[in-house]
Amino acid sequence: ALPIVFNKRRIVNYDSKYDIYNIGDDQGAIQIIDKMFEEEYLPEGIVAINDSLAIKMINELHNRGIHVPNDISIVGMDDIFVSKMVTPRLTTIHEPAEEMGKRSAKYLIDKIEGKSRNIVNITMQPTLVERNSVRKVHSKIRR
């Protein structure tokens, strides 16, 4: 998976100890939540690497009496079908996977047929799908 790049200074109270990589299963979701519960305060929100992990985390938090989005916000990535069927409905990042596949296949065919020798860099715009797993946070960012 590719990393998500953002300016950490724009995130209020960003704490790098929550940067956990290569976790994508039930046990990983529990490990992340266990680590959060060791602290005095829960983070304002979680951005999960995919919707499946976000949904697992919502369920685990619910089992511990933490309610999404009232107590913590969660955002997933990939906009899978089930993300709009869970409670709360998951806010997610929709990536144009079908269009990426079509463009990749066309590029590969052109390369095989000798029509292209150049390396192509294609940028596609993801979209935020706002549902119910995020609450508004009113905070001031220090400069």
Language-model segments: residues:
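Bacterial carbohydrate/catabolite-sensing allosteric modules
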Residues: A1-R143
